[in-house]
Amino acid sequence: MTHSCKCGDSCQCGDKCTCGPKETPKCGCSDCKCGDKCSSDCKCTSCTCKK
């Protein structure tokens, strides 16, 4: 039950981040960890997973 998050979205466990413009749909974020956030510079900021 995964979905794609865009830059700036808060990601959920197992989400695949597809950051950036459509021409480069995967410019740095993939396999987000729980609670990660896709930032505008296409990096996933890590944080602690709360269950």
Swiss-Prot record:
It comes from the Eukaryota. InterPro entries: Zym1-like (IPR049529). Pfam families: Metallothio_Euk (PF12749). This is Uncharacterized protein DDB_G0288281. The lineage of its organism: Eukaryota, Amoebozoa, Evosea, Eumycetozoa, Dictyostelia.
